[in-house]
Amino acid sequence: MNWMQATLLFRPKLLDCLHGYNRERFSQDVGAGITVGVVALPLAMAFAVASGLKPEAGLFTAIIAGFLISALGGSRVQIGGPAGAFIVIVYGIVERYGLANLILATAMSGVLLFLMGLFRLGTLIRFIPVAVVIGFTNGIAVLIMLSQIKDLLGLQVAAMPADFFGILNTLWLNLHTVNLAALLLSLASLSLVVGWLRLSRRAQGTRYRWASMVPGSIIALVFATLVTWLLNLPVETIGSKFGGIPSSLPGFSWPEFSWDSARFLLMPTLTLTLLGAIESLLCARIADGMIGDRHNPNQELMAQGVANFVTPFFGGMPATGTIARTVTNIKSGGTTPISGMVHALTLLAVVLVAAPLA
C-alpha cells in the first residue's frame, strides 16, 4: 500500500455530510452540540478524577479528542471523549507506572488503532464473542463501583489501590472515617438520578418530553452543588481538592518517561487499544440503528487513533466513542459531525470563560 492508496482510504464522514448541507441543519447541529457540551462537562471531569487524574485531563480530552474524532471519524453523530470503561485501566497504569507512562501507553494505543483502521481490521471487531465483551465490561463495572465507594462514603483515603482485593481491604480499614454529610448527599443524588430516569420515561410523548433529553446525572449535579453551597457542607469540591480548573489549554508537553517501566506497558497498551476499538464501534453501531445510517468502522478507528496519539501530549487521557453523549446528540437533533465539533468548542468556551469560577 503506497501513500496515495492510504490517502484514498482516509475519508472522514464529514466530507460526505457536507453535500446538501444547509442553514437549518447547521442550526440543529449547533443546538445539539451545545446540549452535548453541557452534558459532557461534568462527565469528562468525573471520569478523569475517578481515573486518578486531575479534572482538567478529562476536559482537555473531551475538547481535543472530541473535536478530532468528530472531524475525522467514520460516523455522522458519534461523540468522542473520556469514557467510564477506561477508568480501571487508566487508574492501574497511573498507580503502577506513573503519569508519564500513561501518556506513552495512550499514544502507542493511538498508533495501533490507526493501523487497525488503515489495514481494514475494523470489520473484524464484530466477530469478537458477545460473552467476552459482556464479561469484560461487567468486570470493569464492578471495579468502577468499588473504586467510587470511597467518595460515596466520604472516606479519608489518600490513594486507592488498583486491584480488587486491595480496594476491599482499604475500604474496610477506613470505614471509621465515614463523612455523614457526603453519604447523605450521595444517597440523595443517586435517588434523584433513578427518579429522574423513571420520570423521563413517563414524559416521552407528552409536553414534558424535554425531560427525557436531560440526563439525571446533570440534575443530580446541579442539586448536589446547590445544596453543598447553600448549607456550606463539609465535603470536598473540585476547587478544594484540585485547586480549580486552568483557564486555558495546555501547550505541547513531551513526558519524561522511563524505558525500564515503558517495556512493561505492552499489555496495558493492548488493553486500551482493544477496549477503545470495541467501545467506539459498538457505540457507532447503536447510533446507526437510531438514525438509519451506516458508519465506516475503519475510518472511525483511524480517527480514534489520531485522537489518542495527539491528546495525551496536551494533558489528556485515553478517548473513545461514548454511548451516553452520542445518544444525547441524536435526541437533541444532531445530524452530522458538526454537532460533535460544536460540542468540543462549547467545552473550550467553558474552559476559557468559566474555569476561574470553579
Task: List where the protein language model places each region.
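Transmembrane helical cores of multi-pass ion-transport proteins
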Residues: M1-A358
